[in-house]
Regions:
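Metallocofactor- and cofactor-centric catalytic cores in central/energy metabolism, strongly enriched
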Residues: 1-81
Length: 81
């Protein structure tokens, strides 16, 4: 079932990557949009780069984006973590 999943604080290496990894393992969420949000743009970009590599490595179908704009990130979110 496609969802828009927003991960607040995703620039934190432990939280962001572990949460993305857990989502990638869920077949029911495959095809969902994952929005990584953090106020630290540098850390956020690093997390997105690793998340994209994991996505390619594991061959899963998720749309992963990143934003420092909380209001935009939360727009039409179905799940917020």
């Amino acid at each position: 079932m496609k969802q828009k999943i927003v991960l607040i604080g995703a620039g934190s290496a432990n939280f962001g990557l572990e949460a993305v990894s857990d989502i990638y393992r869920s077949k029911i969420l495959e095809g969902s949009d994952i929005v990584l949000h953090d106020t630290d743009e540098k850390s956020l970009k690093e997390t997105q780069a690793v998340a994209d590599k994991f996505k390619d490595k594991f061959g899963v179908n998720f749309n992963v984006t990143a934003s420092t704009n909380r209001k935009e990130s939360l727009k039409r979110a179905t799940v917020v973590v």
